[in-house]
Amino acid sequence: MDFALTEEHLMIRNAARDFARQECLPGVIERDEQQRFPLEQVMKLADLGFLGMMIPENHGGAGLDTTSYVIAMEEISKVDASVSVCMSVNNSLVNWGLEKYGNEEQKQRYLKPLAMGKKDGRLYIGAFLLSEPEAGSDATSQHTTAID
């Protein structure tokens, strides 16, 4: 079995590494100490296509494989945990569920802008929240109702 990275994987790694060093590293300590959301950095993640890496192109994503996603996450996580968590939640918790279980209308309405990271020129990202009193941090024990 060949575990060597492909040329595409190496390009993703270099792009993620450059982004982390040039865009995330400057100010990372200040953002963390001031508890500031890394808005500028997450907007640039969207520009790079890193907010919908494994989502097919017809749904606004980059259509890349899981290895590409993991490589990019590793490079960004080395420098800025806040930016990498935004990337992780959007890609794996939010987009994955919509891609796997959403109908076509939901994919067009929600998944496409989430995978692109923008809607009408504004940041558009998903979130994951544990706030149910009976569940605590046990997500499988939550009970909720969706309202559109």
Predicted regions and their residues:
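Intrinsic disorder at enzyme termini
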Residues: 1-11
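A non-catalytic, amphipathic alpha-helix used as a structural packing/dimerization or gating element
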Residues: 11-22
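Glycine-rich flavin
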Residues: 24-148
